[in-house]
Amino acid sequence: MWFQLRAPYIRRWEAEHERPFFYAGAAKGADVALWLQAAHLEHAALAQQAAAATLVDLVKAFERVSHIGLLTAAKKWDYPMWALRLSLAAYRLGRRVSTQGVLSAIVVACRGITAGSAFATTELRLLLLAALDHIHAAFPMLPLYVYVDDMFLAATGAPKHVCRILTSATKQLVMLLQAAELEVSDTKSEGVASSPWLCLQLGKALAIHGITFSLSCKSLGGDVAATLKRSVSVQKRRLRDLRARRPRIARLRKAAVGTARLFRTGFTAALTWGAHVVGVATTPLMQWRREAARGCAAAAAGKSPDVVLLLADEGPAHTTDPAFAAHALPIGYWARLCGTRGGHARTWLLTCAAPGSASPRPRA
C-alpha cells in the first residue's frame, strides 16, 4: 500500500524523463513496439533496401541490477531518493538459504531488484537511461525500441553501410550495458537481416557477443522478418502447444469448467499474439478454429466449426472463434497506428511516404 500511495510521484518522474524509444506505457505496449519493428523492416524490403536489426537481451536483468549503480543513476537523473531508499531497504532485507533442512547464516543481497514490485520496471529504466540516451544521440538515424530489458536496434540502406553502422551501434550498446554491470545474453540475443550475405557478415562482426543472424527471428513474442517472405515459426509452435493440451482441456470440460471462456480470455489471445504483424493464413486459421471447436464441444469431430463456435458464444459481445481476431487485428492496428488520431506511427508513415521512398502498406 505504501508503494501504491506514492506511485504518482514515480509516474511524474517517468513523464519528465520520457523517451521516444521507451515502450511499456500508456498506448505503447509490446504489441505496438512489435508492429513498428516489423514495419521498419518491411518498408526497407519494399523499398529494395538492405535491412538488419539486433535484438539485445539481458541475463536476469532484474537480478543483476547493482544497488550502487542504481544509486549513482538516481543522483544523476534526480530520481526521488526517498522512494529509492525504501526500495533498497526492501531489497536488502536479510534472508537465509535453506537446503535439505539446513539453514545458512543471514545473507544480505547487494544487487538485484524484485521483478513485479511497484517500481522495479522504473528502476531498471533508470539504470538503462544513460546508455540508451548515448546510443540514441550517437545514432539518431537508427530506430531504437526498448521494452523493459529487450532492446531492438535496426538499420537500413546499402548492405555495407548497414553492416558497418549496425555493428558499431550494437558494440557500443553492449559496452555501455556492461559498464552498468549488466550482462548481455549470448543465447537470447540475436539478429535478423535481409540477405544471407548480410547475415554472414554481421554474424562474424558480432560473434564475440554471441549474436547470430538469420532471415527471421522472434521479437517480443512475435515473428519478425527482414524480407518480404512471412515468417510464422512462432505461430506454428503455439498451434502445436495447443494441440498438446487437448487432454488437459478435455479433463476441464468433463469437470464442468467453461472451456469456451478459457478460449475467449486466454487461448485465443495467446494464439493470435503477433497476428497483427504477420496475419494468419487460411490453413493455420482453420486448424486453430478446429482446435477451439474441439475444446468447446464434447464431441466436435466431424462437426462444423462454424456452428460449434457460434453456439459457444454466450452473448453478442463474445468472440470464441479465433477468426474474429485473425481478421480484425491486422486491419485494426494499421488503422489505429497510422490513422489521423493513431499517434505513434504517424510520423514514421509520413517519413516513409516522402518522395523517393516506397509507400508502406500492410501485408496482403
Go through each PLM region and give its residues.
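Nucleic-acid-interacting cores, centered on viral/eukaryotic replication and modification enzymes
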Residues: 1-364
